[in-house]
């Protein structure tokens, strides 16, 4: 027989070891990934009934010196023995589920799950949660900018994601947007490719496929795009483009200049084009539709690194052929190398404010004008929402509705503190930190409210370059539960490593600890349900025998339990310096 092509499983960060084990006792093999150098050394991916590995679950525990994972009692569920890095204390633990504790209000501190993505070196990739198939549940769309593919994870009724389906698309897709563009009740997906300098649109066909995108005619290089309602009842594709234009020069010869324009296109093919200021030179990172001045008309907000925020304020009627007034406004706290925005109704007036970050806090702002003939525009601060501390660095924000309150809960991603901060508005109308939840990973650039298992938003999604994640606020949470502990009675002993095996033929596996200060083997008996009982111990060698070799590796350095004599009984084999020591099991 031959082996099929390997199925590649990406993972978050780095991993020093991987084991195939049944971690939850369902008789299906799961994956345990270990990185001793990480503050959260253990993470796992459970295998579901469909044979698919679920997202990564990271667990917090003190630093470890070594570990051993095995099914000690034959119940098809893995026990884990760890040796603490500093104290040298051994612990017997299991992966267990527990009901989530209350976080704030009616929300629970549910599970944080991370879905690794196929890695890319591109600075940006398209990521989007949207209801693609019309079942009322949001699906996850992930662009592979290097391979010219689009991965679609359809959401199941229980809130889990199915294995991704792959569809061909442009290479270098940096932006994804979705809306019912043509009013047919189906979701259209828009893709912007920086490599191919194109914008395309596609939607699910009758066979459940996403055909290759049809090009949107632009005749220019697209810089950024979004889709949404600029006018009530219709979605528009909004694109910033850059093209070359020729005009007479000073000496009468033609000169080539770069022109930037805003293009608003409907599904009927009609498009309006508005030239932008010649001073607009930077590379925009995003374009959004938002009523920035709260006049009831949707505006276009453009973010560009190191530049002012450009707002294209929609007029009630065109003026000199232009529907938008182009204004550049200084953000509170100055420009940023990685600008971002969020939207929230922070004062309970039913209108969303623009949330802009300045290191450790957010400011909710509204665009205002002095009303003059040549109006001066600026941002008026309505609220300030502080992070958990002065050392916070807020890199993303999102909201969830809070039952019984006009004001939502505001979630802040704190990159420097590696935490998710939950803020709420108190009875006096002041925003305060209600809770801070530590996160194992914070390599994300965006947050979004999504619904898992429901049409209503009940979860916060995290968006990153090589992974996505989500934090639930209900259900159960995984934890690493200690069942028993053990400290060696060897004086000044230093437990270096551990393995397991049945050394007395009772059907249960014993623990073999390697102690490396006095060169002992320390046997510990595992007794049901989960008790560690001291057993036999002995020195492997006299210290003076290897005195000249004390600068070498700690000894004994490896052990294995196996039947090497062929009598059907397990033996103990040690590796010590340049020797292999065999301890046969006696009859």
Protein language model features and the residues they cover:
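Beta-propeller-forming repeat regions
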Residues: 1-587
